[in-house]
Amino acid sequence: MKRILLAEDEDVLRMLVVDTLEDEDYIVDEAADGGEAIELFQNHPYDLVILDYMMPVYTGLEVIEQIRNTETSKHTKILMLSAKNQSFEQERIFQTGADYFMAKPFSPRKLLELVEGILNGEI
C-alpha cells in the first residue's frame, strides 16, 4: 500500500484531498504546515509528498529543501500544488527539487489521475 504525505494549510482542501486519496486505499498522513510536514517526513517513509506552496512555519519550497537534504528522499516523489502558476514560479519549484506541479484550483479527479500516474510510474 502506497503512503502519501499531504501538507496543505487550507483545512477544507486538505480534507477533500485526504478523502479522495483514502477512498482509493492510499495511506495519507496530513500536515497543516511546513513544520509538521518535515517532522512527519523524518519519521516515516513516503512514496509521494504533496505540498502546498504557501504554508505557515515553512513554505513548500523550504520543505522540499529539507526533504531533499535527507538520504531517505532519493526515491520519494514530490508534487507541488500552487496558485502561483507562472512559468518562472514553476521553474523555481522544479529547481528546488519538486518532481511534479499542479496548479490550483484543481478537481479531485485530476489530482487522483496525476497521483496514480506518478505512483504507477506512468508519468
PLM feature segments, named:
Residues 106-115:
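C-terminal output helix
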Residues 55:
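Receiver (REC) domain active-site loop signature in two-component systems and cognate sites
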Residues 15-23:
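Charged docking surfaces used in two-component/phosphorelay signaling
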Residues 30-48:
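Acidic, metal-coordinating helix/loop segments flanking the phosphotransfer/catalytic sites
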Residues 8:
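Conserved acidic carboxylate
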